[in-house]
Amino acid sequence: MKKHFFLLLIIIISSCSPKNNFQLNGDIKGLKKGTVILAKSINGVEVTLDSINLNGSSKFSLNTFLTEPEVLKLKLTKSGTYNDEIEFFGNIGITNFKTNLKRFSYESNFEGSKQQEKLDDFNTMLNRFKEENLNFIKTQIEFSGNQEKLDIINRELINLKKREMYFIINFSINNNDSEISPYVAGKFLKDTNQKYLDTIYNSLSKKIKDSKYGVLLKEIKEFKN
């Protein structure tokens, strides 16, 4: 009788557990052996959602349960240490991932999430700002003995930072019906002027305001008050 009771209890618990509704199918060309980990941050603590040990195959499949679109982390370990990791926007359904072992982050490609498509566009533009910034730094070194030239470069650097900030603001407002908007604003604009955060938050649709990143953005802007 007791045995039947515990068996019934296990069945009930299993039936109440959320079913996996997100699947990441991946292929890391060149990988022969290693561990691939799917993780996310919960209240600042990284939690492993799923993992798989690979030995002789570069392909894998990882699964978890999502309540809404959110940023996940894919990590690769070899010889017991973390070697590479990349963040991406996961959504309910199937996401396909491809990359090269030697250029894990640089050649990564995610398909299946509309939020990730927008994040890819955002990162492409952000990388252009980073390249411009590096070019200015190289020029600063080149003209380190020319104060007049350095003053000009410094002004251009300030303008570059402003252009980058306004790009992020406009991107957030233009994508106000996507979780990407409060995520980007909360990550890159938390130290900016309060009025910009208010403008972005007020532009969000109700669904996005109630999302994980909408709630976080609200907390960030209220903390600044």
What are these regions (language model features)?
Residues 6-8:
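Sec-dependent N-terminal signal peptides
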Residues 12-15:
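C-terminal motif of bacterial Sec signal peptides marking the signal peptidase cleavage site
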